[in-house]
Every structure is written in C-alpha cells, then in structure tokens.
C-alpha cells in the first residue's frame, strides 16, 4: 500500500545537523575557531550522508500523508517514525475525534479505535498529519539517539583528518625502495566503517 507525503513544516539546515560543532572540535582536540566554518560544512555533509545511508529523514518535521482505500488495514504504518505527535486525522473528509485513534510512536503505527478497542481502518481516503523524527543535539530537549550523533562526529573527524590525502591510497611506506598500496575504488563522501556500524539499527531495510 502506497501513500503520498507532503512536508508541511520542514526542518531548517541547522535543525538537520546530527551533531554539534563543539562535539566535533572535542573529538579533534581543536580549541580555536579557525576551522569552524569548514567543520560546520562537513557536519552538514555528514548529516546528509547519514540520512541517505539510513534511507530516511532523521530530523523532526511535520508532514501530511494521504492513503487511498485503506479498508481492512490494521494498523496503518506511517512512512516516518518515531512519531512524536499526531496533529490530526481525516477520514473521508471528516476530522476524526482524538479518541478514535492512537499511535505507537516508536514503530510509526496508527491504530483505529472503536470503544477503545483496536479495529481495522475503513476509509476510501485517509489523511494523517503528524510530527516525526528526532530533535537534533543543537535543539532544546534533543531526542536524537547517541549512536546517530556519534556516527556524525566520527565521519566529520575522519573527513577533516583525511583532507589533502589521496583517497585512492591505502598506505605508503618508505623502507629502502619504498612501497604503496592502492584501493580499487574510492568515494570521498563515503561514511567511515565505524559510522556505518553505529547506524546499522537505524537503516530502513528493503522489503
């Protein structure tokens, strides 16, 4: 079952940053402000790469999602999660009372309630507006899991340390005549293995 999704309140660039500048500078043992602009740019790049790697929007946004012919569906699975709040539900053009549905936020499930019991949805058109995702570390009351934030810090630190290096060069040793080792392919935007490991539980798996 497919749906159409519209973002009604998008996260700003700053509210998409999955780690703080302070955390990155602490990781790199940098006290000066000389590199702040460059590091912030790397944070933006890492945040985008992590969202792409996880195949989901991580920052908190409010969206409107519409389904057609959901009769027999139990529960409705929202495209984004975790869900922090349901703004409203409209069933065949009629706003539903708040006591006729409930959400399982961590799973992104939306249940229809009849006399406080869970039942299958019966609707030709169902529209749900909800807020989903996490509040990032720079926001008040941040909710982003530490693993995601740590993955961003690791990626930024690795990219910063690797600046100026040949991305195709694995190692280079000088002992007598010297030696070099080259990798077959390289992607300067690739996330480090440690970051990928930290993110494994947050990746959306293909059906």
Which residues does each PLM region occupy?
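Divalent metal-cofactor coordination and adjacent catalytic microenvironments
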Residues: 1-207
